[in-house]
Amino acid sequence: MNSAIEEQLATNLYYDRNFDCETAKILPGEYYFTAKPMLIVTVLGSCVAACIRDRVSGIGGMNHFMLPDGGGDPGNPLSASMRYGAYAMEVLINQLLKAGARRENLEAKVFGGGNVLRGFTTMNVGERNAQFVRDFLRAENIRVVAEDLNDVHPRKVYFFPRTGRVLVKKLKQLNNYTLVKREQDYASRLKSNVVAGEVDLF
């Protein structure tokens, strides 16, 4: 029997001298949230990241995920692929609400969905991820105040939840293959595992 895939709270914390603050680095399948004045950073290829924050309290977080490349109808909200995407978003939103964020104050900035991984589906996996995150946030009535989606370049995203500031650096030359390998490994794990449990928003 396959083990379940669960979104993991990022554990890679360090001090960033350039920005003079504590920083959390998140990898595919991870998320992080905080009420502190700190930085959350990730590098995206085909994956997407939603930076969600309470614009009043400054409680915010970021996730990093992609939809599994499963068979069936990828647009069907009941498909395993769509259920995993909803799960990845709900884990972050629930953690923000538990930390004291108010649903009516949530706003989002979304990034990624680049055309970086090839050969997963007939539809570009990055486009699928980007469309999913837009549709999910619209359905949840969470306003998207900024986005940088699709394109062919990976991105490095710096998110300061306390202020809502985001810096995006497009990586025109990605000379190492770490990012692509990391996303391919993540996609393989998603495809060979089932989603853990159901998550309900409260």
From Swiss-Prot:
GO terms for biological process, alphabetical: chemotaxis
Which Pfam family would be a valid example here?
A: CheD
Q: What GO terms are given for molecular function?
A: protein-glutamine glutaminase activity
Which reaction is catalysed here?
L-glutaminyl-[protein] + H2O = L-glutamyl-[protein] + NH4(+)
What HAMAP family does UniProt report for this protein, alphabetically? CheD
Function description: Probably deamidates glutamine residues to glutamate on methyl-accepting chemotaxis receptors (MCPs), playing an important role in chemotaxis.
Supply the PANTHER family for this chain.
CHEMORECEPTOR GLUTAMINE DEAMIDASE CHED-RELATED
From the Swiss-Prot or TrEMBL record, give the protein name.
Probable chemoreceptor glutamine deamidase CheD
Per the UniProt record, the source organism is: Thiobacillus denitrificans (strain ATCC 25259 / T1)
Q: What is the lineage of its organism?
A: Bacteria, Pseudomonadati, Pseudomonadota, Betaproteobacteria, Nitrosomonadales
State the encoding gene. cheD
